[in-house]
Amino acid sequence: MHNKQQVKIGIIGGSGLSESEAKKEIITIKTPYGEPSCPYEIEKIDDIEVLFLRRHGQKHSIPPHKVNYRANIYGFKNFGIERIFGVFATGSLTENIPPGSIVIPNQIIDFTQGMRANTFYEEKKVVHIDFTEPFCSEIRHYLLETARKIGINVISHATYICVNGPRLETAAEIKFFKNIGADIIGMTIMPEASLAREVEICYAAVAVVANYAAGISKFPLTVKEVIETMEDSLDAVGFLIKETIKKLPEERKCLCKHALKNASF
């Protein structure tokens, strides 16, 4: 049986990231925002326990625009989680970031505004969090340092543009997104990242580039291509996250834990 007080790290991923044969402890958490994507799982990394959640549900049955992001993040907060690693499949908008690349993005452009429930503060209290730097600087530092030490090549700076989906983009949309500064594209980082900031959870992303986006790829885009590339990269991503978790200091020294300070009237 786990000690809830000792589980401080969460991982949000898709199918395939958590496939160990060890018996897992299943945690069901109820929230005022409805049901999370699925029950949480307690995983063990050496002697460190982490709380894992499959963003799209146990059988990848929830499309990006239907994920209950508020319930998912609330569940982590309710459990006492202080840091979250988000894992993503993305498309590349530039030939400088080829399929198979592992990216630690540092910026976000959100094209889901107004389409998804994106805040915990809709009534009684108005909160405006500082989202200048959308990812935890401390986790990013340890991800990049760990990648260098264990010999995993990562791209250290990239802007992730989040779209609503579930359809893939047109070639004209991709050209536009590239022109406004996006490097990789996906459908799930928002409002996940900003909700984590609203509850003062540190959050960082590890993105796998599954394919070139529309108009850049010379071939039709397929889900099979995404799945195959993700499967090829999961070992490296899992190893990077596990080794990073082992190096994180117990006490957080970033600004994320004070995100609500001076954020409301």
From Swiss-Prot:
Although this enzyme belongs to the family of MTA phosphorylases based on sequence homology, it has been shown that conserved amino acid substitutions in the substrate binding pocket convert the substrate specificity of this enzyme from 6-aminopurines to 6-oxopurines. Catalyzes the reversible phosphorylation of S-methyl-5'-thioinosine (MTI) to hypoxanthine and 5-methylthioribose-1-phosphate. Involved in the breakdown of S-methyl-5'-thioadenosine (MTA), a major by-product of polyamine biosynthesis. Catabolism of (MTA) occurs via deamination to MTI and phosphorolysis to hypoxanthine. Pfam families: PNP_UDP_1. SUPFAM superfamilies: Purine and uridine phosphorylases. It comes from Thermodesulfovibrio yellowstonii (strain ATCC 51303 / DSM 11347 / YP87). Keywords: Glycosyltransferase, Purine salvage, Transferase. This is Probable S-methyl-5'-thioinosine phosphorylase. GO terms for molecular function: S-methyl-5-thioadenosine phosphorylase activity. It catalyses: S-methyl-5'-thioinosine + phosphate = 5-(methylsulfanyl)-alpha-D-ribose 1-phosphate + hypoxanthine. The lineage of its organism: Bacteria, Pseudomonadati, Nitrospirota, Thermodesulfovibrionia, Thermodesulfovibrionales. PANTHER family: S-METHYL-5'-THIOADENOSINE PHOSPHORYLASE.
